[in-house]
């Protein structure tokens, strides 16, 4: 444990070195969380754009594979799953708030393929966009 390690240090310098290492590890963990938070912020802000993990990782100066692993570890979801959840959440709001066509809603939330939009919507909501809209009417 940390207490035993501190007690076992022989000199004040050893103690300082140990504490510096612990703080460094702690800050490294915080930076990882900060990177994931930045990704979540980008998804929340720009979900309707053509987003990719590769592009975001370039902005953050971090390896895309590593960033994908961090996202999975921190959120228990992949980048694509998080993006789809955000887009579908926005689509649900548009479907209920506006009378836009389902195709228009699809494009408004960032999908370029209506068939794929239907597939993802059904997977996450358990029903088609049309059925989702009708349930409230």
Report the location of each language-model feature.
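C-terminal amphipathic alpha-helical interaction region
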Residues: 53-55, 61, 118
